[in-house]
Curated annotation (Swiss-Prot):
Any matching Pfam family: CbiM
One of the GO BP terms on file: cobalamin biosynthetic process
Protein name per its UniProtKB record: Putative cobalt transport protein CbiM 2
Keyword list, A-Z: Cell membrane, Cobalamin biosynthesis, Cobalt, Cobalt transport, Ion transport, Membrane, Transmembrane, Transmembrane helix, Transport
GO cellular component, one term: ATP-binding cassette (ABC) transporter complex
Associated pathway: Cofactor biosynthesis; adenosylcobalamin biosynthesis
Subcellular location(s) per record: Cell membrane
Membrane topology classification: Multi-pass membrane protein
PANTHER family: COBALT TRANSPORT PROTEIN CBIM, PTHR43627
GO terms assigned for molecular function: cobalt ion transmembrane transporter activity
Length: 235
């Protein structure tokens, strides 16, 4: 998913920076507010950030100028919301660009938009919808992480197709031709990777509920009755 350094035309680098900066700035505001109100959340914040870093570093060859890997943003989106997850993703993406030659600084805006903004938004919406529908909790986490991952790659395909349309982008034919090719190539690796990510995310959330369920209840991520049920405690 990480679009490599220098691959996008300058105009698209600027566009994605302009789109991403306000969301990340809002996320910084929310993160500062959260940490001031609840210092005990720092260990969970660290786990969410580490999960994003580890999973998104497991890259596989894919579309020219990009790669395939899990994103790890579903957990952060469920617990902290999309804005704070955008900040965590930005920190991870900057580190990977500087020290792992994974992604790039000029393409940072595009990578943040796909992995740090759209993916978490989709995961968050899936989680909220699933909770309202009273689905199995771990199934909700699985779906949120899986679909959030797929959304990231759909957006990355869109970014690449806009930058490199097969023909005149103004006719949209060139865009859709390129988009379909990028999506098809990504799907070979990303469909199974996202499913694995969903399963791992559900397992990690099970651990978090056992270790820090009080913070999740306090942040209104999950209600006390459901926590007791998931932990096998009497109602």
């Amino acid at each position: 998913m990480h679009i490599m350094e220098g691959y996008l035309p300058a105009i698209w680098c600027i566009v994605w920076f302009v789109v991403s900066i306000p969301v990340v700035a809002y996320g910084v505001y929310k993160l500062n507010k959260l940490v001031k109100e609840e210092r005990g959340i720092l260990p969970v914040l660290a786990v969410a950030g580490a999960f994003i870093f580890v999973l998104s570093s497991l890259k596989m060859p894919s579309v020219t100028g990009s790669c395939s890997h899990p994103t790890g943003t579903g957990i952060g989106a469920i617990i902290f919301g999309p804005a704070i997850t955008a900040v965590l993703s930005t920190i991870v993406l900057i580190y990977q660009a500087l020290f792992l030659a994974h992604g790039g600084l000029t393409t940072l805006g595009a990578n943040v938009f796909s992995m740090g903004i759209v993916g978490p938004i989709v995961a968050y919406l899936i989680y909220k919808t699933g909770m309202k529908a009273k689905l199995n909790f771990y199934l909700i986490v699985f779906l949120a992480a899986t679909l959030g991952d797929w959304a990231t790659y759909i957006v990355t395909s869109t970014e690449l197709a806009l930058a490199f349309p097969a023909g005149d982008i103004l006719t949209f034919g060139g865009f859709f031709s390129s988009f379909s090719k990028f999506v098809a190539i990504f799907a070979i690796t990303q469909v199974p990777l996202a499913i694995v990510e969903g399963a791992v995310s559900a397992l990690l959330f099970k651990y978090i509920i056992q270790a820090k369920s009080d913070l999740l209840v306090e942040m209104k991520v999950i209600g006390e009755p459901l926590v007791r049920k998931l932990r096998g405690l009497p109602a």
